[in-house]
From Swiss-Prot:
CC annotations in GO: plasma membrane
Localization: Cell membrane
Description of how the protein assembles with itself and partners: NDH-1 is composed of 14 different subunits. Subunits NuoB, C, D, E, F, and G constitute the peripheral sector of the complex.
Catalytic activity: a quinone + NADH + 5 H(+)(in) = a quinol + NAD(+) + 4 H(+)(out)
EC number(s) per entry: 7.1.1.-
A GO MF term: NAD binding
Membrane topology designation: Peripheral membrane protein
Keyword Cell cycle carried by entry: no
Known function: NDH-1 shuttles electrons from NADH, via FMN and iron-sulfur (Fe-S) centers, to quinones in the respiratory chain. The immediate electron acceptor for the enzyme in this species is believed to be a menaquinone. Couples the redox reaction to proton translocation (for every two electrons transferred, four hydrogen ions are translocated across the cytoplasmic membrane), and thus conserves the redox energy in a proton gradient.
Name of this chain's protein: NADH-quinone oxidoreductase subunit D
PANTHER family according to UniProt: NADH DEHYDROGENASE [UBIQUINONE] IRON-SULFUR PROTEIN 2, MITOCHONDRIAL, NADH-UBIQUINONE OXIDOREDUCTASE 49 KDA SUBUNIT
Entry's family note: Belongs to the complex I 49 kDa subunit family.
Length: 366
C-alpha cells in the first residue's frame, strides 16, 4: 500500500494578529514545512499617490503621516526633503535641528513598537507592555510640539510648523537620560529570555550579498553586517555634525534584526542629546511664497527612516499641485524577500520571521 501525500495551501491572514494589520500570506506547506510563500498586500491600499495629484504641495503633508503611521515625523521629512530639493530651498539651522530631534524621537518610538510587538508575536506579552509604556512619553512629547500624537503633520516645506514649546527640552532630556535604563529592562525581559533566543537565533539567516541584491535597507540590511546608513554614508540635514555609531549584525538572523533596533535606539538618544546641546536660535522656516509653485522639473530625495530608506520622487509641471509623487517605501521593498526567508522553515517560524522584518501596512500598501 502506498501513502499519498500532497502539499497543503494555507491562507495566513488577512485578519491575523501577527501580520500587524490586514496582510495575507498564501503558504504552500509540506507537512509543517513552508515550500512557498506568496505575500498578498493591498488590503490597506488607499491610492495615496493618485490622491496627491489633486492636492497642493502643502496639503500632501498629512497624507505622508498615514504611510508609516508609527513614524509620521520621518514620513513628513522624506516628502518635504524632496520638494525642498526641487525648489532649492535653504532650511534655517534651527529648523534642521528641530527636525533631527523629532525625527530621532520618531525612530525610537517606531523601534519600541517593533521590539515590543515582536516579543508579543513570540509569546512574551510582558515586554510589549514595557515598550509601550515608554513610547507613551514620546507620544506626549509629540503632542506638546505638534498637537497630535500619531499623525503630527509637523514638517513644512522650508522648515517646521512650530518652534519648541516651553518645557519640551527638559522633558525630552529626561526621557533620553532614562532610555538606557529602559533598554536594560528590555534586555532582561526579552533579549535574555531563553525561549526568545531559541525562536530567533539562527532563524532565517540572510546573507549580505542577498540583502544588497534585493535592495533591502534599514535594520534588515544592517543585521547582515552591511554598514549602510544614509545618515553616515550620504549625510542630509545636519547629521554630519553628530557623533554616533551604526550598529551592525553578524549573522543576519531574526535575533540580529531584533537586536539592531535596540542598539539603534541608544544611538538615536545620543543624537538627540547632541542636537539639544547644539541647537541655535533663529527662524524655524525659510521665506517661501504662501502659494508653493516649484519650477518645472523633477527631484528624488531619500532619508533613513526607521524601516529603511524612504525615498520620494516629485514631478512638477509648474502648478500649485504635483504632477506626480511616488514613494520608495522600505517596508514594501523589504517584504519582497519574504518568500526566500520563509522557505524551508516550519509554520511556527513564519510569525517570528515576518515580525523580524517589521512591516507597517500603511506604508506597504500606500
Amino acid at each position: 500500500m502506498t501513502i499519498k501525500t500532497e502539499e497543503f495551501l494555507l491562507n495566513l491572514g488577512p485578519q491575523h494578529p501577527s501580520t500587524h494589520g490586514v496582510f495575507r500570506i498564501v503558504l504552500t506547506l509540506d507537512g509543517e514545512t513552508v515550500v512557498k510563500a506568496v505575500p498578498v498586500p493591498g488590503y490597506l491600499h488607499r491610492g495615496i499617490e493618485k490622491l496627491l495629484e489633486s492636492r497642493t504641495y502643502t496639503q500632501v503633508i498629512p497624507y505622508t503621516d498615514r504611510l508609516d503611521y508609527l513614524a509620521g515625523m520621518l514620513m513628513n521629512w522624506g516628502y518635504v526633503h524632496a520638494v525642498e530639493k526641487l525648489m532649492e530651498v535653504e532650511i534655517p539651522e534651527r529648523a534642521e535641528y528641530i527636525r533631527v530631534i523629532v525625527g530621532e524621537l520618531s525612530r525610537i518610538a517606531s523601534h519600541l513598537v517593533a521590539t515590543g510587538a515582536y516579543a508579543a508575536d513570540i509569546g512574551g506579552l510582558t515586554g510589549f507592555i514595557y515598550t509601550f509604556r515608554d513610547r507613551e512619553e514620546i507620544m506626549d512629547l509629540f503632542e506638546m510640539i505638534s498637537g497630535a500624537r500619531l499623525t503630527p503633520s509637523f514638517m513644512r516645506i522650508g522648515g517646521v510648523a512650530y518652534d519648541i514649546p516651553d518645557g519640551f527640552m527638559e522633558r525630552c532630556k529626561k526621557f533620553v537620560d532614562y532610555l538606557p535604563e529602559a533598554i536594560k529592562e528590555y534586555n532582561t525581559l526579552i533579549t535574555g529570555n531563553e525561549i526568545f533566543q531559541a525562536r530567533t537565533k539562527n532563524v532565517a539567516i540572510l546573507s549580505a550579498e542577498k540583502a544588497i541584491d534585493m535592495s533591502l535597507s534599514g535594520p534588515v540590511l544592517r543585521a547582515t553586517g552591511v554598514n549602510y546608513d544614509l545618515r553616515k554614508v550620504r549625510p542630509y540635514s545636519v547629521y554630519e555634525r553628530f557623533e554616533f555609531e551604526v550598529p551592525l549584525g553578524t549573522k543576519g538572523d531574526c535575533f540580529d534584526r531584533y537586536y539592531i533596533r535596540l542598539l539603534e535606539m541608544e544611538q538615536s538618544a545620543r543624537i538627540i542629546q547632541q542636537a539639544m546641546d547644539q541647537i541655535p536660535e533663529g527662524p524655524i522656516r525659510a521665506k517661501i511664497p504662501k502659494m508653493i509653485k516649484p519650477p518645472v522639473g523633477e527631484a528624488y530625495a531619500e532619508i533613513e527612516s526607521s524601516k529603511g530608506i524612504m525615498g520620494t520622487y516629485v514631478v512638477s509641471d509648474g502648478s500649485t499641485k504635483p504632477y506626480r509623487v511616488h514613494f520608495r517605501r522600505p517596508s514594501f521593498v523589504n517584504l519582497g524577500y519574504l518568500n526566500e526567508m520563509l522557505r524551508g522553515w516550519k509554520i511556527a517560524d513564519v510569525i517570528a520571521i515576518l515580525g523580524s522584518i517589521d512591516i507597517v501596512l500603511g506604508e506597504v500598501d500606500a
